[in-house]
Every structure is written in structure tokens, then in C-alpha cells.
From Swiss-Prot:
Keyword Zinc among record annotations: yes
Species of the source: Lactiplantibacillus plantarum (strain ATCC BAA-793 / NCIMB 8826 / WCFS1)
Cellular compartment(s): Cytoplasm
Catalytic residues as annotated in Swiss-Prot or TrEMBL: 86
Protein name: Thymidine kinase
Length: 192
């Protein structure tokens, strides 16, 4: 039975490596997958999913006006699975299109992304995935500064925490850190 999955976690929780692993497992059994990612994420070039451990592969970029349902229907309506990286950047209409892929095309859709931004506000895509997903699962990682579970993302600029600004600023370890609640509100000064 096809379902819509949302797997969320703080930065460095292994979301992208999980997508690559799931894709590999399907493809090893000669089952095709469709991988999509946000067109906003250009750290490794637009149209790629890349993990911090160095694995990378092509993906179809999703922009604000992209119709994901039509991409899947026209590209491969017999795909075994649709995998979405950086799902927090999806718009409401994208999430509804993913639900249609599950309900009409009977293809499971697995989405991976951040739940909340550095201001501790939900991303639009995450908000609607939390509402419409059949299954929701947290991917865990540890706080950058202690051994507690990281549940938030903290933005730093010049070694100082940042709590205001634009929601979307693409960056990796140089800009964002996974943190526990305590270190979100009381972070140490970075000396890197």
C-alpha cells in the first residue's frame, strides 16, 4: 500500500544519506526510483543530492512552479518509489501533488527534510507534510555542543548565533549547527 512518508531531523541527521541508501536498495532489485530535490539547494550544483560523506547523484530539481505529479506521471508512472530531498522547501501545492501521487498513481513517496528553521518556525513544506503525511518519523542526531539529542538548527555568522533574518540561506556546516534546546538558547561562542 502506497503511503506518504515524512522523515525529518535537524542538520547532520543523515537525511540525504538515507535517500541514497533507499534508492540503492530499490535499484539493486531492478526497481526504478525518481529522486527530486529543491532547486534552491545549489551547494553541489542544482539538480543533485549530495551527502556530507561525499556521496552524490543526480536528481530532478523542484522549483516553486514545478508540478511534481506531472513530472512523475510523464517520467515514470511505474516507478517503485519517489524520493524527495530538502522537503522543507516544498510549497503547499507540492505536498498536495505528492499526496496525489500516492493516492492516484499508487506510488510510495518518501520525503526528507528539516522540520523547523533557525528561528524555530516551521518551513512551509514541513508544515504541510506534518498535516498530510501518512507516516512521520524523526531522524535523530546529537547536539554539536553536548551529548543531548539535537532538535533545533542554529545559524551562526562570524562565530555569533543568529536568531533573525531570511528563512532560506543555503549552507552546510559553516552556517548551521544541530543543537539541543539548551544550546539553542545558550550557545557557546564559536572559535572556528
Amino acid at each position: 500500500m502506497a503511503q506518504l512518508f515524512f522523515r525529518y531531523g535537524a542538520m547532520n541527521s543523515g537525511k540525504t544519506i538515507e535517500i541514497l541508501k533507499v534508492a540503492h536498495n530499490y535499484e539493486e532489485q531492478d526497481k526504478s526510483v525518481i529522486i527530486l530535490t529543491s532547486g534552491l539547494d545549489n551547494r553541489d550544483g542544482v539538480g543533485y543530492v549530495a551527502s556530507r560523506i561525499g556521496l552524490k547523484r543526480e536528481a530532478t530539481p523542484v522549483f516553486d512552479d514545478t508540478n511534481i505529479f506531472e513530472i512523475v506521471k510523464q517520467t515514470n508512472p511505474d516507478a517503485a518509489c519517489v524520493l524527495i530531498d530538502e522537503a522543507q522547501f516544498l510549497k503547499k501545492h507540492h505536498v498536495l501533488e505528492l499526496a496525489d501521487i500516492v493516492d492516484e498513481l499508487k506510488i510510495p513517496v518518501m520525503t526528507f527534510g528539516l522540520k523547523n528553521d533557525f528561528r524555530n518556525e516551521l518551513f512551509e513544506g514541513s508544515k504541510y507534510l506534518l498535516l498530510y503525511a501518512d507516516k512521520i518519523e524523526e531522524m535523530k542526531t546529537i547536539c554539536w555542543f553536548c551529548r543531548k539529542k539535537a532538535i533545533m538548527n542554529l545559524r551562526f555568522h562570524d562565530g555569533q548565533p543568529v536568531y533573525e533574518g531570511e528563512q532560506v540561506q543555503i549552507g552546510g556546516n559553516e552556517a548551521y549547527y544541530p543543537v539541543c534546546r539548551h544550546h539553542y538558547f545558550y550557545p557557546p561562542k564559536l572559535t572556528k
